Amino acid sequence: MQIVGDHLAELIPQGGTILTQCFGETIIGTVIRAARRQNKDFKVFCAETRPYLQGARLTSGCFAQMGFDTTVITDNMVAYAMEREGIDLFTSAADTIARDGHIANKIGTFQIAILAKYFGIPYYVTGIPDQDKHSKDDIVIEMRDPQQVLSYRGIPNTVPEVKAIYPSFDVVPPHLISGVVTDLSLIHI
């Protein structure tokens, strides 16, 4: 996976600003190491990634502890950050990459990809294509416990009569993706 980190780090402009979504444990570590080897410095904005807050709890800490200027934003601040904070590149890992170019990643990735396209910001996905997933129709979206949306750390954030849904992933169509960074190369879509 270090090769994936190397390829992704090459896409990040020196002194630039990137936006991340969720926490791709392996790729975060490899891109940080690659950026350090390439003497690259850049700012990082991490979407908090509710309801588990992987962006805030995990991704932001990795970048900050390695000396990158890191800022956490709530998931509903992405357009603001793209418009006013100089985001140069959006990146996420992919839980699934279908052979037709659709990807599945943590819920919220699709809306960020739409905003990136609107603002002309390239979106690069990291991962390995799934040979058994031919199209978006082969991607199954797991529904998780909606209680995780209705409370935070055991404290309810709404009244008991309110319901919630929690799809774990959403699917991003290939026309919103600039490229897929794999262990072999950068595949432009």
Name these PLM-found stretches.
Residues 119-134:
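Glycine-rich phosphate/pyrophosphate-binding loops
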Residues 105-111:
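Charged helix-capping and loop-helix junction motifs
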Residues 79-105:
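Active-site/ligand-binding-proximal alpha/beta "capping" segment
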Residues 142-183:
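Polyanion-binding loop/helix "lid" in catalytic or ligand-binding cores
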Residues 187-189:
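Conserved small/polar residues in nucleotide/adenosyl-binding loops
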Residues 1-72:
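N-terminal active-site beta-alpha-beta segment that forms phosphate/nucleotide-binding
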Residues 33-38, 64-66, 83-85, 111-123:
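Alpha-helix C-terminal capping segments
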